[in-house]
């Protein structure tokens, strides 16, 4: 049976995959994540997830390789990682009272057979109306500078929301486990009896 590789260095994706109790290794994919001109959010995350998984095929020739990529969209615009506190406050002010959609692309590539499975999972985050003081307090307490959308739903960020809508809450953190389990079963790797 092929071994499992997570094409990511994200500690959040690693922690999510550990929930399945299947042994795996992590490896950093070498992929240019620059969007193509006019590329739609769904197309972008699908292309990048697939590229991440396939980029490791030569290094891991008899493996199941998981690639994942996520973007955040608000008012039709891709919202990246803020990197500064000021940008985080701006992103949260814009999200206040609005719906932010996350698109997570998932790819599972069997490097032995060349079989590729892909999926894009949307997830909507309904923000409640936030005061400037709440935004300042949140950014100061959680420091979400390396998180798309400027929040961590697995932490204090949950206090920013009115409600969440999506098939799998793990999608919001970066790895849609329900879809991944379906893909793994198609490759004869059932997490329940692995």
From Swiss-Prot:
Per UniProt, the keywords (alphabetical) are: Cytoplasm, Hydrolase, Nucleotide metabolism
What is the predominant subcellular site recorded for this chain? cytoplasm
CDD domains registered for this protein in UniProt = Maf (cd00555)
Look up keyword Hydrolase and say if it applies. Answer: yes
Required cofactor names: a divalent metal cation
List, alphabetically, the InterPro entries matched: ITPase-like_fam, Maf-like
List site positions: Important for substrate specificity: 12, 70, 154
- EC category: hydrolase
Pfam family example for this protein? Maf
GO molecular function annotations of the record: nucleoside triphosphate diphosphatase activity
Question: Where, by residue number, is the active site?
Answer: 69
Q: Which GO terms describe its biological process?
A: nucleotide metabolic process
Q: Where in the cell is it found?
A: Cytoplasm
Q: Indicate the family of this protein.
A: Belongs to the Maf family. YceF subfamily.
* Function in brief: Nucleoside triphosphate pyrophosphatase that hydrolyzes 7-methyl-GTP (m(7)GTP). May have a dual role in cell division arrest and in preventing the incorporation of modified nucleotides into cellular nucleic acids.
- This chain belongs to the protein called 7-methyl-GTP pyrophosphatase
> What organism is the protein native to?
Salmonella paratyphi A (strain ATCC 9150 / SARB42)
